[in-house]
Regions:
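A domain-level signal for the structural core that forms small-molecule/cofactor-binding pockets
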Residues: 2-67
């Protein structure tokens, strides 16, 4: 039973997350030959101020991109 955990910054819509999980499920069915009922996917979301890349929080990066 494949179990996939996705860690990502918060901010995507419920529809986007569900679509992503469905696509991943289908990719596992196609490429691993597993039954979709055996695929488990979990999303762990973090607030943008709890994630950092290149020494800047995602909030800081978003603000800089708007300038």
């Amino acid at each position: 039973m494949p179990e996939i955990t996705i860690s990502m910054a918060a901010g995507r819509t419920q529809e986007q997350k569900i679509g992503m999980m469905r696509d991943i499920t289908q990719a596992l069915v196609k490429n691993l030959g597993v039954d979709a009922d055996n695929v488990v996917i979990q999303i762990n979301e973090a607030p943008l101020y709890h994630k950092m890349k290149g020494g800047k929080t995602f909030v800081e990066r978003a603000a800089a991109a708007k300038k």
